[in-house]
Amino acid sequence: SNYINQSMDLHLLNKEQKIAVEHQKGPLLVLSGAGTGKTRVLTSRFVYIVKNLKFDFNRIIAVTFTNKAANEIKERVNKALEHNIESPWIGTFHSIFAKFLRKHAHYVSLKSNFNILDSEDQKKLIKQVLEYCKIDKEVSESIYLNEIQNLKDEKIFPQDKSKILKYSSLENIDEIYNIYQQRLIEINAVDFGDILLHSYFILTNNKDIQETHSNFIQHILIDEFQDTNLLQYDLIKLLLNNNQNLFCVGDDDQSIYAWRGAKIENIINFPNEFNCEVVRLTKNYRSNNAILEAASSVISNNKNRLGKNLESFNNEIPEQKINLKSFYSQEEESLWVADNISRKYNDQETFGILVRLTAQMRSIEDKLIKYALPYEIIGGPRFFERKEIKDVLSYLKLANSQSDDLSFERIINLPRRGIGEQSIKIIIDHSRSNNLSFFESLKDLAQSNKLSPSLSSKTQPFIDLINKISDLINKTSLEDLGIFVIEESGYLKMLENEKNKLKQIENESRIDNLKELVNALSEFENLDEFLEHVGLVNENQKKTHQNSIKLMTLHAAKGLEFDHVYLPGWEEGIFPSSRALEQNSTKSLEEERRLAYVGITRAKYDLNLSYASSRYTYGINNYSLPSRFLSEIKSINLEDTSYIENQNDTNKPKLLSSDNIALSPGKKRMMEFLNKHKK
């Protein structure tokens, strides 16, 4: 492809890119803003050091965060060097160090043909360990796996008992980590965390191996440097020799994975630590000026950054202001997003809807379906396919139709009631020999006193609960029914009682989704109608479409770009999230602001920001303020079109309050807000 050949014509690089690529020796940090051509710089750098500085390409490490990026570099470099390189040193951290580990496996008591376990296998293994340690079944396998993963990322070994206990409050975590690790060695296997931690152990405990490797490696290139964690950064430093040929490309303003262990300090402190210069790439080839100025003015409110300002170098895209809309309710906001897309939609242009919380997706999905617009969710399941939603729906389905065996199996022991495989087998065998559904079979066993007292005490509350829900179906609103199931089943408590920090964050999102399920229920009169709606929504999505609208969280949007971008829900408590507001630390707020920067810079020319002044959650109307990030955008780049609706357009559904939208409370607050913040 033309682009690849160009990547080596140095005269096609802009001035800053060229300075970076032609850097001679020693460390360099390239601060590459959104859309400034960092892949081209990395590739050109690789080719430049081979062709011009005469480095051997087998002795260059190029680390990326995805296989896709690694393949892109290989492909472009192969083209430019006209020569097919199969270097073990180009790839992700995990692929590079897995090869290293196979060579030196015996240093950590493994054989070189060790297996890398996927998450299913890891779960099976930890389950054995938890049973062996007699840990209460209430705590799930993945909590322990996550915690062990975190310990590994923090360079804490199973034998560092005091460090483990200082870091984690999980019951018996020190013993479990230890036994889990022994089991891995016994079955000649590693998990993802081991690939890096074992390599770190080998390099720090065997001076000869470390020296051999650091002398062999002539140059190291790192992509997405702002996403590195402690362990990854330390591994790289162990492979550096005295020339310190380290070329890091990254953007501190796009560091949004702190919750996964990424350390923004790595990139912020790099220039001091290595006493080196910083090349800033600021010419952006993606977005128009209004968008870049907005992104720059928002992110400039962060104190902890190295600093740079982007400027637009794409003459082919229209200059237009950012569209700002305020709505009375989330319902109205979602309807507008779908309606606006349906007016602009065509096969040539791309559309992205980026939300802060997954719970925002449900009402948007709903409206996209109403408008028959093709969409897909990137980086996660659709709303009604999410685990927590399917779990709670299974209660409703079983209560609605007691012969629904699939739902019965899904929830009989969820939340855990101590009803194990054996007990479930008794119920199923009885159902087969008596031609009953699973739930009828359980009721039959209970009525005829055929269950052991201990099993009976565990299953009776479940029978009572399902009967109670069945009874309520025709007596109460669906909204109240949903709340009843979520609370009385113990499902909400199970999510709230989480001990593990990472899981807590995930569970907050699950709880938001359950509240959103209650909102969805409140829009229907009866349960059958609602369940049919769910079936149709899921069916509707099986058909794929060439140019579908992409719906995703801001985290999943990193690295993507769209002609048209919609950023709904810019309200305090949603964005910045309530979690960040509760922590009330500069650190968590700055991370949210970086997310805003990532969101804004995904758009080429059409950017639509919106917020609702009230959101209906869990039966209550919550009023909220516009996000502080809106007031950080200079008003010169914004156009508030909240009250300009296409009133004369009769064939589109009217917005609920289109008649009085000019005077809606949201509108009034927006005006006050904008007047107050006129820059």
Q: What residue ranges belong to the model's regions?
A:
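Acidic, low-complexity intrinsically disordered tails
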Residues: S1-M8, N637-K679
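P-loop NTPase Walker
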Residues: N2-S112, I116, E211, E293-S296
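Conserved helicase NTPase motor core
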Residues: H11-E22, G26-V30, V41, I61-A62, ...
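Short glycine-/polar-rich loops that comprise or flank the Walker A/P-loop
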Residues: G26, F55-R59, I85-S87, D121, ...
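Helicase P-loop NTPase motor core
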Residues: V30, A34-L42, N275-E277, T282-P374, ...
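Short, polar/flexible loop-turn hinges at active-site or ligand-entry regions and domain interfaces
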Residues: K54-R59, K79-P88, K103-L117, Q128-S140, ...
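Basic/charged alpha-beta structural segments of nucleotide/phosphate-handling enzymes
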Residues: K123-A189, K207, I264, A372, ...
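Conserved helicase C-terminal RecA-like lobe
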Residues: K166, M361-D366, A372-L373, R386, ...
